[in-house]
Amino acid sequence: MSLVFDKWELDEVKVEDMGLAKYICLDSILVPHTMGRHVKRQFAKSKVSIVERLINKVMRTERNSGKKNKAYKIVQEAFEIINRRTKENPVQILVKAVENTSPREETTRIKYGGIGYQVAVDISPQRRVDLSLGFITRGAMQAAFKNKKSIEECLANEIMLAAEYDTRSFAIQKKEEKERIARSAH
């Protein structure tokens, strides 16, 4: 049995949101790096480990663009901080944060006769997970920018706040904003 970062088991991690269960991959993997084998098939990224998807989202930001090893170390240290503070499996905390920050509705623009309307639509589970991971990493990057706190601390803090559904979390704020806009478009 392999462990994430050679420390945490994925067997004990549970996904409570049944809509996301199929899209949050918890396969055992020692080093979360698949070298982009999933990009050629449409829904193959749902088979990529949730930890690797978080690493890829951290890597996509301006400062860490293309630096997979740096992003790997950021996520690994953030997981260490989460484990020290909560004494729980950090992958379970991450899964809880993804469940809490994934929006269920958003708006899309539809044109009828040259006039554009905003219409509320349900979000697919794949997009919900993508948006959630994006909100978490963007919140961590914004918290770490021009701040004494390291990116690792900010990422750990953002994940823990999101897992507790704390409104101080950037990801929770963005989720609620997206759902509020969708409700007003009904």
From Swiss-Prot:
Spell out the GO cellular component terms annotated for this protein, sorted alphabetically and separated by semicolons. Answer: small ribosomal subunit
User: Ribonucleoprotein: present as a keyword of the record?
Assistant: yes
Extent of the signal sequence? none
User: RNA-binding: present as a keyword of the record?
Assistant: yes
- Biological process GO terms, please? translation
Write down the Pfam families for this protein, in alphabetical order. Answer: Ribosomal_S7
Q: Which InterPro entries match?
A: Ribosomal_uS7 (IPR000235), Ribosomal_uS7_arc (IPR026018), Ribosomal_uS7_CS (IPR020606), Ribosomal_uS7_dom (IPR023798), Ribosomal_uS7_dom_sf (IPR036823), Ribosomal_uS7_euk/arc (IPR005716)
Q: Which SUPFAM superfamilies match?
A: Ribosomal protein S7
Going by the UniProt record, its keywords in alphabetical order are: Ribonucleoprotein, Ribosomal protein, RNA-binding, rRNA-binding
Task: List, in alphabetical order, the Gene Ontology terms for molecular function in this entry.
Answer: rRNA binding; structural constituent of ribosome
Q: In UniProt terms, what function does this protein have?
A: One of the primary rRNA binding proteins, it binds directly to 16S rRNA where it nucleates assembly of the head domain of the 30S subunit. Is located at the subunit interface close to the decoding center.
**What family does the database annotate?**
Belongs to the universal ribosomal protein uS7 family.
Subunit structure, as described in the record = Part of the 30S ribosomal subunit.
Its protein name is Small ribosomal subunit protein uS7
